[in-house]
Each structure stands twice: as C-alpha cells, then as structure tokens.
Swiss-Prot record:
Purpose: Bidirectionally degrades single-stranded DNA into large acid-insoluble oligonucleotides, which are then degraded further into small acid-soluble oligonucleotides.
Catalytically driven reaction(s): Exonucleolytic cleavage in either 5'- to 3'- or 3'- to 5'-direction to yield nucleoside 5'-phosphates
Domain of life: Bacteria
Protein name listed in UniProt: Exodeoxyribonuclease 7 large subunit
Family label: Belongs to the XseA family.
CDD domains: ExoVII_LU_OBF
Record's subunit section: Heterooligomer composed of large and small subunits.
A biological process from GO: DNA catabolic process
Length: 444
C-alpha cells in the first residue's frame, strides 16, 4: 500500500485551490458573450462568459452591478475584469467581476483613457492655459453639421439672447473616418484668420463610436494651441471627449454653449439703464459741485473787488465817525454836567449868596423872639463870613499895601525874584491902579 503523507478534506482541497488561483491570477481581463444572465432580488449579477469552445461562470455583486451603464442580456459581447477564484462550497471555478462593459466600446474606452492620460501629462489640459470667453463677441464661428437640430438650436439661442452677434457656420462632418481631419482643418483656418472672437465646436448626442472623431489627438492639440477661445459642446452632459478636455470651456449641450457665448440682451438693456442712471446722477452731482464752486469763487471775487473793498471801508469810516461823534457828545454832556455841578457848588459857597440868604432869613424871624440876641448872632456870623471872604480875597492883601506882580509877556504871577531877569517887563497891581515896570536890579 502506498504511503500517504497527508490526507485532505474536500474543503481543504478547495481552499488550497482557491489560494492557488487567486495568487496566480490576481486580476484578469476576459472578452466573450453573455449567457445565463441572472439578476435576483438581491441585486447581484450572475452570468457566464463563453466563446465557441468554453465558458466560465462570473459574479458581480450589487455594489458594482448597480453602476452599470447598460443592460446585460443574452448574446451581448462584453469585456470583463475581475479576480479568478473558487467557490469553496460547491467547488465552482468563477470570476468575481468589478468592471463590465460592452466589448465594442471597451477597446475605444481603453484607447481614450490611455491618450487622455498621456496628453494630460504633457499639460495639454492645464487650466492655466485656458482662455476666457469674450464678454461681448461680435463674430462667432460654429463648426458643426449644417443639417440637424444642433445648428438650429445654436442660431435660435444666439439670436434670442444677442441679435447683434454675427454667426458664421463652417460646415463639417461630425462623424466618420474623415470627420476629425476636416474639423481640425476648419479650426486651424478659423483661428489663423483672426476674424472670430470665439469658435464653437458642436455635435449632438450619440454612442462612443459616433463621437470618436472628437477624441482625435491632432484635433485636441489644435484646440489647445488655438489663439481664439474655443468652446466645445459635444454629445450629452454625461459624454466627455478629448476635445472637451482641450477646449477653453466645455458646455454640456450646444444650447448651453450658445448661452455661455453671448450676454442676454435684456440683462444688457437693464445694465445699460442702470449705467445711464448712474451717469446722469454723476453728471448732476458734478454740475451741482461746479455751480457751488462757481458761487464760492464769485463770492470770493466779489469780496476782493476794490469797489466792494472801498465801499466796506467807507461803511467802516462812517461807523467810526458816528461812534466818535457819539463819544464826543457823551464827553461834552458829561463835562457840561460836571460844570453845572461845580457852578452850583461854587454858587452855594458864594458869601454874598449866603448873606442874601441870611438877610432873607432875618426877614422871616419871629418878632416874638429876642430880636437883639438874634441880631447879634447873625451879625457875628456875618462878620465871620466877611473875614473868611477877605482872607481869600487877593485884593485885600493889596489894600494892606502889598502889590500883585505878573510877567508882562505871559501874565505869570511872580512869587520869587528868580522868576525874572534884569530887563524883564512886569505888570504891578496896586490897591488903586496898575504899573508896568522894568527890572533894573534882581537879588535873592
């Protein structure tokens, strides 16, 4: 009997086989026809991939199968990617898929992705190279098919939004083997002419094969090198081509591209109206400022006018004269009042007035009073007043043998011999008469 080193169970054998398959085939691509398509309520997808000689079971679980962009069906040729494994419970050999696409588009998508990565690495799609669209384009070139809904939609939107724009259709094939070369030639001619403010490349929706002309490398390079802003509108919103990546702006549809190219005339009219109002307001403000400035300059000029200055000086002079006259009148009135007060006081001190008053008082004395005593008192008072008057009367001094001497030239009273010199003429007042004498001798 042969020696048995190790005896395996079915599960152990299947586990070893699974590990061997998964390590030997980590990821495989396989192309074939779909068969035995099953999609139960769990959402998982179960199919077989087959060719004329063989078939292999495949499974795609719900997290992946729910994102499929097509409906798997019997006989459909597909390209699948997955991991080779073994279902241990039944010992079934199968592939767990993570990607599934229709075989015809699969090769195209791989070629597209490889070219996109290469051009992107060159910086062909760098946002820094993108040009902005003109704000108010005057002439636009449209490269598209001359027939179909695309050009009609573009014309309709452009005319509705901005009728002033000039549109030039550059008719071209948008599908087929020669389409890419024709579009590239028209784009190069339009850009080099310098006649256009923007260039629109447009096409309606279609399959990947229908849109393949816009994945041409030479077309993408021509778009990226154009000096004129280029906007692309190719296929539907979910479709992306190399022309979209190279263009300055990518629009989801041709109609949206037309809206992006030109401003809305209604918004422009509204904006122009606002600008007009702002301009009118600014003009009125400037005019008001100019008028105010002119008024200020006029007032300053008027203030510096010599005639105005002289008139102002005359007014000030008249005012000063009036105030001086008032001041003089006030001083004169005050002096006259003081003079009247002094006159009244001097009149009250006059002995004659006092004597007259006393005499008048004597007339009204009561006869019943002791007349003799009263008369004596009044006589004594009268004698006192007379003596006081005589004491201050300079003529009384002269009457006693003295004389009043004045200088003849200035009538100055001479009190000291030092006030005169030999030869001076003096006027001498005597008790009776006056003498004019000349000084012969002067001694102190």
């Amino acid at each position: 009997m042969q020696h048995r080193d190790e005896i395996l169970t079915p599960s152990q054998l299947n586990t070893l086989a699974r590990d061997l398959l998964e390590s030997a085939f980590p990821l495989v691509w396989i192309e074939g026809e779909l068969g035995n398509v099953s999609r139960p309520s769990s959402g998982h997808l179960y199919v077989t991939l087959k060719d004329a000689q063989a078939q292999v079971r495949c499974a795609m679980f719900k997290p992946k199968s729910q994102w499929l962009t097509f409906q798997p069906r019997e006989g459909l040729r597909v390209l699948a990617r997955g991991r080779l494994t073994l279902y241990e419970a039944r010992g079934d050999y199968q592939i767990v898929l993570d990607h599934l696409e229709e075989a015809g588009e699969g090769a195209l998508r791989r070629a597209f992705e490889q070219l996109r990565i290469r051009l992107e690495a060159e910086g062909l799609f760098d946002p820094a190279r993108k040009q902005p669209l003109p704000v108010h384009p005057r002439r636009i070139a449209v490269i598209t098919s001359p027939s179909g809904a695309v050009i009609r939609d573009i014309f309709s939107v452009l005319m509705r939004r901005f009728p002033l724009v000039e549109i030039e259709l550059l008719p071209s094939l948008v599908q087929g083997d020669t389409a890419a070369a024709q579009i590239t030639h028209l784009l190069r001619c339009a850009d080099s002419s310098g006649r256009y403010d923007a260039i629109l490349i447009a096409r309606g929706g279609g399959s990947l094969e229908d849109l393949w002309a816009f994945n041409n490398e030479q077309l993408a390079r021509t778009i990226a090198a154009a000096h004129t802003p280029v906007i692309s509108a190719i296929g539907h919103e979910t479709d992306f081509t190399l022309a979209d990546f190279a263009a300055d702006i990518r629009a989801p549809t041709p109609s949206v591209a037309a809206e992006l190219l030109v401003p809305d005339q209604r918004a422009l009219r509204q904006h122009l109206g606002q600008l007009q109002q702002r301009l009118l307001h600014l003009q009125q403000h400037r005019l008001d400022q100019a008028i105010q400035r002119a008024d200020q300059l006029g007032l300053r000029l008027q203030a510096r006018n010599p005639e105005m200055h002289l008139r102002l000086l005359a007014q000030r002079q008249a005012e000063a004269g009036r105030r001086l006259e008032q001041c003089l009148h006030h001083v004169l009135d005050r002096a006259q009042g003081q003079l009247r007060n002094h006159h009244t006081r001097l009149y009250a001190l006059n002995p004659r007035q006092q004597i007259a008053g006393l005499q008048q008082h004597l007339k009204h004395l009561n006869p019943q009073q002791p007349l003799q005593r009263r008369l004596q008192q009044e006589q004594l008072r009268l004698h006192g007043l007379v003596r006081a008057l005589e004491a201050v009367n300079p003529l009384a001094t002269v009457a006693r043998g003295y004389a009043l001497v004045h200088r003849a030239d200035n009538n100055t009273l001479v009190r000291d011999s030092a006030q005169v010199c030999v030869g001076d003429v003096l006027d001498t007042k005597l008790a009776h008469g006056q003498l004019r004498v000349r000084v012969e001798v002067s001694s102190t």
